[in-house]
Amino acid sequence: MKSRLETRYTEQIAPELFKELGYKSVMQVPKLTKIVINMGVGEATTDPKKLDAAVVELEQLTGQKPLVTKAKKSLAVFKLREGMPIGTKVTLRGKKMYDFLDRLTNVALPRVRDFRGVPKTSFDGFGNYTMGIKEQIIFPEIDYDKVQKLRGMDITIVTTAKTNEEAYKLLEKFGMPFAK
């Protein structure tokens, strides 16, 4: 069964973008590929148990078991050795991706204090959008009383769009609240 946002994409958003952007084929219309959520836990170098809390929180958010990321290089400045766990990430595709984007745009982002929209400048030039969130407690799935430390996360939305303008129009139609 398709999610609400996925159904809206196939029935409403894709045909609108097809007309607006003047494509010759329906296959040219940009679509979402995946959403990658990354949570860097720098304190994990001294206390590995802090990473476990981040893994549990990310699993509650996405409904998917996160992958623990490890350091690629040793850096003496950060007391870091190659192979040490330093963060966690999840790659969402399909129904879970659309469900997460729906919750992000309609529930989580409006709960951010003094929220005026996400910046339009966070596109990478190839149609992908990356945003940072300072607190994980904006998501209703996270129990505020069980949070040991406020942690931020990076959310990257990967699309098939060729340019920033195409990706902007796609995400705007999905309901992403861009700053005016």
Swiss-Prot record:
Pfam families: Ribosomal_L5 (PF00281), Ribosomal_L5_C (PF00673). GO terms for cellular component: ribonucleoprotein complex; ribosome. Belongs to the universal ribosomal protein uL5 family. Part of the 50S ribosomal subunit; part of the 5S rRNA/L5/L18/L25 subcomplex. Contacts the 5S rRNA and the P site tRNA. Forms a bridge to the 30S subunit in the 70S ribosome. GO terms for molecular function: rRNA binding; structural constituent of ribosome; tRNA binding. Keywords: Ribonucleoprotein, Ribosomal protein, RNA-binding, rRNA-binding, tRNA-binding. This is one of the proteins that bind and probably mediate the attachment of the 5S RNA into the large ribosomal subunit, where it forms part of the central protuberance. In the 70S ribosome it contacts protein S13 of the 30S subunit (bridge B1b), connecting the 2 subunits; this bridge is implicated in subunit movement. Contacts the P site tRNA; the 5S rRNA and some of its associated proteins might help stabilize positioning of ribosome-bound tRNAs. This is Large ribosomal subunit protein uL5. It comes from the Bacteria. Signal peptide: none annotated. One of its GO terms (biological process) is translation.
